[in-house]
């Protein structure tokens, strides 16, 4: 997953019948079949894992508190972080409320740590922040890169979509899902495609993505550029540090930036991961979510329709994911590879 949250929703996950059935709304978080499946899978998996940890007398709440109260100050020399979770001897409604408060607390504490270099509780107490999880700052410059604009969307759709006009060829040498798979066979010639397909293929050649080799085979001009585009098509964002480890990958990012195909971002969570958090917690970027932070912050948690156990495990999942993203970032900046300011190289 390359430090990505894999459970987030992707627009291209929607099947054609889902596009037909869903009514477009301005602030609507896309919920494909895959997204719903992931939601149920992680709920049941985390519930089972927590039950196992409790039987071994090492509840997940203790592990999370150990990370913030012991590991950060003693292992990384970062002091001041604090969370307060409730144990299994209280009801799920109280436990869910405690986790919701901890998520909001870590949002404020980490934002303060990045901006001021320490967790300043006086500053946090008087700081009024709107909990938009897309905007938690990062210690790493240009942490992510994203596809940019309609030219990027048109290009990646042409290359990687199973609905692309380039998916099929006159001579099918092997069943393929997209144009990318066809070219990767290493046996496709321009004559293998229909006349109506020649114009978009020629456009790909003119833009430097394809070339015709001496024996007439269509090949990728720079496979590293194509792999980066494929990564962006399937996951919507990439972590720049991963691509900075290879000079070929770094050249691919430079090419895409010079082609105005990508833009850079420097937040703890990617734009898509931030929307995932917002979907569950508030109404900042979507209006069709459970709004769990608002639910527990405003005392609207009573009644037969409120499933506190489900809400608790969803909130606990978010706290674990947020903790893992913080851990990955803090470990990353102590690694020699992250000492390079990536923005100077792209």
Residue spans of the language-model regions?
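Short, amphipathic alpha-helical interface elements at domain boundaries
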Residues: 18-19, 26-189
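Amphipathic, oligomerization/interface secondary-structure segments
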Residues: 120-346
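Charge-enriched, short contiguous segments at helix-coil
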Residues: 2-86, 125, 275-346
